[in-house]
């Protein structure tokens, strides 16, 4: 599906963005491994999260969608061997966290995915899990899906420092460590998003975490986990698109309520504020360890910045839309130390640069990042290849709203990966200037 957007639009709305994708995935996983019945409200019914549900159903977890809730009947890590291959579709989170969970199970499983997921490296997860005693076989190409997994009931505890901060790798090791024969210690620097730790602590797992001298440490002891009740807040990664839309469009403002404000996720707010963005955070409350609140953003004159290395893990999913903001800013923006972007749904360094250039922006690809020379006057409408990457498609759509003329976003239906009603909200909440 291609989408046409007539530019020079503005927004003055309260926008309801989808539930948080990271927490939606983890709620199904924790519910499946818990003892008892987990109730989940405000779940994200996107392609990625549905892949997680289907995989756990294939592992014999009883998951029921009941009105606006999901009911998960957990069996305390007593999963059953799947009768078919576990298809993770396009979801890296499903795949990598499942590798950790399946490492605790004695049966064999095979995981696969779509053509995009098959290009994403998996040894970063399988190497430390192998050290714990799980067995992996790459069935087609070394380091890539499909993978055969054989777990163990006698996993060895691990002390492991992540070479590159990654919430997915860290989470896989945490899940496996819950069933290891002793204390495991996982370290990373800087800290990546910590939803797994917070949610497992809420479910009664024996987990401690702390930061010292720039190093984040998680200590895990073998644990049973209890069922939870959770209402999932809105996803700040999805909110970021409408925040930037308000910042770069003349006479615009947006209000987003019930949004996740976990400090490991608010890097996009911090960097935009450094660029001069008028953004306010209001009505903050703590829900089971997660901060939730209201975000208000208004049209702003932005300036270029150099993004700090320690901020990269906190903005890794938002870099395409941050780059759009940078194209409208005055001066140079440098985003570096972001090699992880090379192995996302697309090579997001390359595809973000190509997307910006399509609109006439001056930008350059760096080895591990990008450099953008902002100039609103140079920007024009465009036909943009999304590369079937949901975050590229949405970032391009926001840019199309702010430039003059009609733009076309190719393969725009990929937004269903994380934000199925993105275009409904975009067109209903904006109007021509």
UniProtKB/Swiss-Prot annotation:
Pathway note: Metabolic intermediate biosynthesis; chorismate biosynthesis; chorismate from D-erythrose 4-phosphate and phosphoenolpyruvate: step 6/7
Top-level taxon: Bacteria
Record-listed E.C. numbers: 2.5.1.19
Gene3D superfamilies reported for this sequence: Enolpyruvate transferase domain (3.65.10.10)
GO cellular component: cytoplasm
Example GO biological process: chorismate biosynthetic process
Pfam families: EPSP_synthase
Binding residue positions for 3-phosphoshikimate: 21-22, 26, 166, 168, 317, 344
Top-level EC class as recorded in UniProt: transferase
Species for this entry: Caldicellulosiruptor bescii (strain ATCC BAA-1888 / DSM 6725 / KCTC 15123 / Z-1320)
InterPro entries reported in the protein's UniProt record: Enolpyruvate_Tfrase_dom, Enolpyruvate_Tfrase_sf, EPSP_synthase, EPSP_synthase_CS, RNA3'P_cycl/enolpyr_Trfase_a/b
Compartments, record wording: Cytoplasm
Classification of source organism: Bacteria, Bacillati, Bacillota, Bacillota incertae sedis, Caldicellulosiruptorales
Protein name: 3-phosphoshikimate 1-carboxyvinyltransferase
